[in-house]
UniProtKB/Swiss-Prot annotation:
It comes from the Eukaryota. SUPFAM superfamilies: BPTI-like. One of its GO terms (molecular function) is serine-type endopeptidase inhibitor activity. Belongs to the venom Kunitz-type family. Serine protease inhibitor. The keyword Chloroplast does not apply. This is Kunitz-type serine protease inhibitor bitisilin-2.
Length: 90
């Protein structure tokens, strides 16, 4: 095989390795919990992972209790639930 062919193969394998882990990992169970404002009456803007739409969505958190599907930023939500997986844990 020529050096150009090897370089192309190496590039394709690198691309495949970068894309494969996203679909091979499992989402944490808390990513499947519904948004939970909790019983308190504060108004904190937060984000939760909506497993039906597969998106991080904004909601208002009351400030206490709730659940672990509660993130201060959309980026944090994506890091924990969106980018880490493509299928629900079994």
């Amino acid at each position: 095989m020529s050096s150009g062919g090897l370089l192309l193969l190496l590039g394709l394998l690198t691309l495949w390795a970068e894309l494969t882990p996203v679909s091979g990992k499992k989402r944490p169970d808390f990513c499947y919990l519904p948004a939970d404002t909790g019983p308190c009456m504060a108004n904190f803007p937060r984000f939760y992972y909506d497993s039906a739409s597969k998106k991080c969505k904004k909601f208002t958190y009351g400030g206490c209790h709730g659940n672990a599907n509660n993130f201060e930023t959309r980026e944090e939500c994506r890091k924990k639930c969106f980018a880490s997986a493509a299928r629900r844990p079994t």
